[in-house]
């Protein structure tokens, strides 16, 4: 991995880039006042972002109390003899090593060789697990005849907690003075839009490397490293967006309209006269490129006048547009308007190429279609297109204002040039900039002008260098010349805006930071409320649930077309949108977070309603009241969650159990032990038993029981839902190879019952969800932990657990309403720590 000092602002003078058609030296483009070298792992506590297989907490999340005053020690007695490392080692040898020693390591934890180096993050995590188990009375096991006394346990707990606190202090002291976090792809695109008024497609193939994810999160500093391939791509991207925002000459938009005849492309069977007008006839399989030769970042406005012919009892056709051969559409809508009342649909996008497709039928002959019967009625869903119009380049009024503010009105006024450049750089770098830093960019402009470039070309070179700087690409916290544990006002402004907007602070937030006012509680609360009310908070309501719930995995294993013919991209997109819109509704209405576990409503469009066996009008997502017989409510019974925990062929109870344990309960699930025989779903007798039956038999093995008893029940609660989230009353053999309804295979009653490790029983998803609600405090702490991970861009460790519990506890009196939880997080000490 190349050191980030090789970014353009730190290149030696021999390194050159091409800009504006010729080579340019960027050494002078960047001030010498660059931050301290960026570590190979860009975020603090890099070790905290690595899964530690030696540490497990299968039953509950790892809640560690880091303060002696908060220890939940039930015993008040003190150890008679002073407790030290020797005492603890003897304690382990007497009570623990039989199960956690050389011959046996239950839970992948070995204590006879556990080091006493509490400053080490990994070792500290293991000691934290020991503290949790001893303090909770779970270890040593109650069945052991020779158990330690309450006095011994209290002494060991107090000693471990003290040493853990010392270890935390040592790690803080050892942390570097500066932390850097690379922008994610989506954040880069958001900033470019907010700063330059350019909508840049960061997902375009070949533009940027895909961001490495850690447990679903895409913004974790320790895994968003900088490779050599990134550097050139960042420069090219900066040059591209600046050339669009500050062109040599602003070109007027060109409007191109394709009428029905042109759309038909000479194919007479694609033209039809309906309602006195010649129209282009489109049906399933119809595909046409309607826009090409665009430039990434230049927006195009697309308008189309369309109507539909829907057969009696049939579905409506869907008009879909795809960009740059991407699998997900940029526009997808059912067309319901009759032929005598066509509608105009429109959208805008920043893409290079747009292809139109129509979905709705698959039974017409593509070469010689006969779409109408003898009475002129449609046999299949058909789309009538009167015309399609494109307008490019398309710039919104807001975008025009942003772009106009980038360039000084009077290029000959040196003071105005410096002032405009200073404001842009301060906004781009999200911190105060010095006159010396700006002077280097002014010199670059003058150098370019002397070389014969126009002012706008020279100015573009300066803006490009600013955006190619690591000061832009990395979020910096801390300072090389001072060692501090808390972030300053400017860093707090960035942390808040990236958390809620996925982008840079705006002028009002920066003004509060510049005045040194933002860390004042009343100012911070006011700014927090303002950011929530801004439409840009919609980025948070999409990004956080997508990453927290790992919705990127929906469609990773596309369902078998033979087994699930109804599954398509439209359904997949609807599944994901149900979940993100559900989160957004809880956010918007400030509902209690128990709604995530169980609710009497969901968000739904007609496509998803059909999938659920329900009814809903229209293609837009709306809030729908649920009935008990709908078998829905909360996140866990949404199709997106049920699908991402399946494998494309069948549902996977173990996958579902692991997902619930890790995502909803914050537990750490260890890998399966070596040499475990996998289930054979194709063995001769597989047709006589369900997957549940085979798992029950598998879990009776002694080596499997310990883990499966904690994982499997969580997944068994959702046995009544198949691999694509449909509810079912009967189960199927584990080796099924035909779609639902195959009369030849035997049927079995669904068994969705289970017993949790604490002895509580349930039968079905609804009873299980009620048990989850009983443990609402635990879920609240897990949610806070995930929110903090997203906000602070790093993995939470046991050093953070006391603060996480404090944030959750402060939200309890308001029923854990989501905005209350967010407010308590933002105003917490944790949020302002480096």
Where are these regions (language model features)?
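Sequence context surrounding c-type heme c attachment/ligation sites in exported
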Residues: 74, 79-129, 136-150, 609, ...
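Conserved structured core elements
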Residues: 86, 90, 124, 128, ...
């Amino acid at each position: 991995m190349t050191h980030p000092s090789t970014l353009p602002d730190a290149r030696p003078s021999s390194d050159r880039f091409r800009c504006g058609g010729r080579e340019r030296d960027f050494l002078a483009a960047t001030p010498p006042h660059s931050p301290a070298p960026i570590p190979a792992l860009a975020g603090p506590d890099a070790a905290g972002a690595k899964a530690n297989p030696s540490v497990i907490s299968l039953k509950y999340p790892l809640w560690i109390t880091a303060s002696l005053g908060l220890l939940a020690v039930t015993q008040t007695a003190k150890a008679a003899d002073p407790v030290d490392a020797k005492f603890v080692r003897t304690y382990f040898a007497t009570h623990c090593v039989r199960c956690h020693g050389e011959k046996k390591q239950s839970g992948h934890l070995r204590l006879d060789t556990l080091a006493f180096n509490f400053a080490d993050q990994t070792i500290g995590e293991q000691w934290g697990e020991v503290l949790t188990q001893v303090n909770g009375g779970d270890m040593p096991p109650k069945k052991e005849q020779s158990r330690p006394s309450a006095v011994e346990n209290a002494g060991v707990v107090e000693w471990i907690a003290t040493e853990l606190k010392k270890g935390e202090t040592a790690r803080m002291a050892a942390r570097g003075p500066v932390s850097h976090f690379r922008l994610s792809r989506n954040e880069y695109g958001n900033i470019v839009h907010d700063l330059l008024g350019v909508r840049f497609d960061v997902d375009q193939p070949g533009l940027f490397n895909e961001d490495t994810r850690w447990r679903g999160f895409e913004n974790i500093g320790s895994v968003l490293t900088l490779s050599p391939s990134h550097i050139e791509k960042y420069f090219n991207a900066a040059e591209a967006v600046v050339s669009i925002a500050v062109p040599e000459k602003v070109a007027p938009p060109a409007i191109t309209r394709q009428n029905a005849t042109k759309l038909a492309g000479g194919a007479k069977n694609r033209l039809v006269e309906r309602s006195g007008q010649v129209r282009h006839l489109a049906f399933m399989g119809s595909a046409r490129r309607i826009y090409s030769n665009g430039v990434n970042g230049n927006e195009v406005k697309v308008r189309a006048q369309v109507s539909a012919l829907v057969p009696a009892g049939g579905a409506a056709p869907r008009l879909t547009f795809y960009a740059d051969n991407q699998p997900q559409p940029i526009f997808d809508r059912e067309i319901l308007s009759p032929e005598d009342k066509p509608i105009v649909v429109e959208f805008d996008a920043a893409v290079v190429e747009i292809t139109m497709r129509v979905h709705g039928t698959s039974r017409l002959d593509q070469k010689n279609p006969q779409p109408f019967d003898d009475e002129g009625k449609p046999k299949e869903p058909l789309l009538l297109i009167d015309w399609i119009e494109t307008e490019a380049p398309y710039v919104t009024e807001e975008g025009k204002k942003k772009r106009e503010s980038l360039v000084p009105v009077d290029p000959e006024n040196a003071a105005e040039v410096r002032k405009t450049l200073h404001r842009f750089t301060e906004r781009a770098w999200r911190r105060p900039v010095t006159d010396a830093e700006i002077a280097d960019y002014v010199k670059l402009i003058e150098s370019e002008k002397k070389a014969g470039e126009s002012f706008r070309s020279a100015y573009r070179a300066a803006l490009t260098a600013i955006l190619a700087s690591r000061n832009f690409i990395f979020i910096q916290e801390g300072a090389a010349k001072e060692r501090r544990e808390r972030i300053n006002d400017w860093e707090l402004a960035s942390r808040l805006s990236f958390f809620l907007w996925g982008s840079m602070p705006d002028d009002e937030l920066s003004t509060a930071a510049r005045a040194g006012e933002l860390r004042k509680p009343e100012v911070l609360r006011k700014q927090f409320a303002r950011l929530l009310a801004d439409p840009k908070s919609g980025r948070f309501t999409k990004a956080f649930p997508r990453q927290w719930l790992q919705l990127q995995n929906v469609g990773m294993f596309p369902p078998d077309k033979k087994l699930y013919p109804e599954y398509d991209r439209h359904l997949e997109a609807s599944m994901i949108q149900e979940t993100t819109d559900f989160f957004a509704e809880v956010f918007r209405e400030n509902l209690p977070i128990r709604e995530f576990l169980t609710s009497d409503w969901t968000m739904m469009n007609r496509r998803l309603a059909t999938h659920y066996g329900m009814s809903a009008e229209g293609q837009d997502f709306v809030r729908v009241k649920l009935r008990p017989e709908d078998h829905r409510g909360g996140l866990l019974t949404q199709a997106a969650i049920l699908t991402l925990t399946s494998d494309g062929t069948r549902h996977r109870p173990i996958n579902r159990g692991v997902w619930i344990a890790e995502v909803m309960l914050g537990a750490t699930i260890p890998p399966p032990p070596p040499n475990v025989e996998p289930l054979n779903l194709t063995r001769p007798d597989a047709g006589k038993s369900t997957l549940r039956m085979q798992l029950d038999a598998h879990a009776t093995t002694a080596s499997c029981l310990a883990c499966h008893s904690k994982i499997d029940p969580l997944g068994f609660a959702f046995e009544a839902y198949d691999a694509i989230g449909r509810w079912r009353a009967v189960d199927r053999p584990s080796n099924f190879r035909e779609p639902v309804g195959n009369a030849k295979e035997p049927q079995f009653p669904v068994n969705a019952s289970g017993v949790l490790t604490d002895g509580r029983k349930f039968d079905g998803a609804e009873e299980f969800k009620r048990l989850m609600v009983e443990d609402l405090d635990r879920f609240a702490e897990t949610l806070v932990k995930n929110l903090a991970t997203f906000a602070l861009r790093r993995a939470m460790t046991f050093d953070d657990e006391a603060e996480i519990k404090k944030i959750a506890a402060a939200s309890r009196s308001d029923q854990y309403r989501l905005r209350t939880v967010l407010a308590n997080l933002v105003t917490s000490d944790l949020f302002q720590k480096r």
